Structures are given as structure tokens and as C-alpha cells.
């Protein structure tokens, strides 16, 4: 049997999608028990840049790409799957994921968001929430990751937001 710690990390993008009011998009997963919420994320296909992957994943998971990349978190952030998921999740080929995170500004209408375009859908509900309120949700095994990440992503959004809000409303 393969030692799980020798498995590689899957390259992945994470999307911190903010609306013009500074609220963060989160969605409830359909494949995990216990009302687990997260930001959109997904794998990077071979030959694809992280930026292209982020927009593609957004379109696949929430039905719209109507957003602008405002900032990119420096570096990659890796996490291990819980031991009971290694060998099962992610096709059983990865020990976890290494993520490049993007801060995006949502330029569409709420009615553009569609969770029913995948079969089966990855999410069944979504909300715009204050970034710090995300940490009060059930984030499953990603709780520690989000505790580290959310303050940094919110700060990146705040740094880019003034110019984006002004130009996106013009």
C-alpha cells in the first residue's frame, strides 16, 4: 500500500469572490455531510494558467464568469486531506491540494448565479456574507485553512476595492 505522505498535492485554485458591498460569496457543498460551506475552488488542468483555471472553475461551479481578478495571493497554500479521505477523494491520487488564491470582484447580478449547471451540482445554496462571518460556518476540515486565509484575502480585497467599485459602477 502506498504511504499517503508520498502522494503529491493537486494543483488547485481558490476564489474569494466579493460583491460591491464587500461581502464574500460562500456556497454549501452537496457531497459532504453536516452543512459544509466554502468558497469556489477547483483543479488546474494541464497547460492551464491559474488565472484561466479560476475563471473556468467559477463558471463551472456557480454558472457565471462575470468577475474581475483584483488581486492574487502571493505563494501557494497547501493542505492535507483528512486521513479517512486520502485514497478516496480527488481520485485517490493526491494527499491534498496546493492552492493559488485569487480575490475577484463580482460584476454580475445575483440572478446570474446558477448552481444547477453541473450534474451533480457541487453546491445547493449560496450567500454573500461578511468575510469574518465565514469562520462561524461549518467549514469542515478546511477550518484552519480559512482561519489563516480569510483575513489576508479580505485585506487584499480592501486594498483593491476602491478603484474597482468606482470603475465597475461607471
UniProtKB/Swiss-Prot annotation:
Cofactor(s) needed by this chain: a divalent metal cation
Keywords, comma-separated and alphabetical: Hydrolase
EC number, UniProt record: 3.6.1.-
GO MF annotations in UniProt: bis(5'-adenosyl)-pentaphosphatase activity; guanosine-3',5'-bis(diphosphate) 3'-diphosphatase activity
CDD domains: NUDIX_Ap4A_hydrolase_plant_like
HAMAP family: Nudix_RppH (MF_00298)
Role summary: Accelerates the degradation of transcripts by removing pyrophosphate from the 5'-end of triphosphorylated RNA, leading to a more labile monophosphorylated state that can stimulate subsequent ribonuclease cleavage.
The name this protein goes by in its record: RNA pyrophosphohydrolase
Origin species: Gluconobacter oxydans (strain 621H)
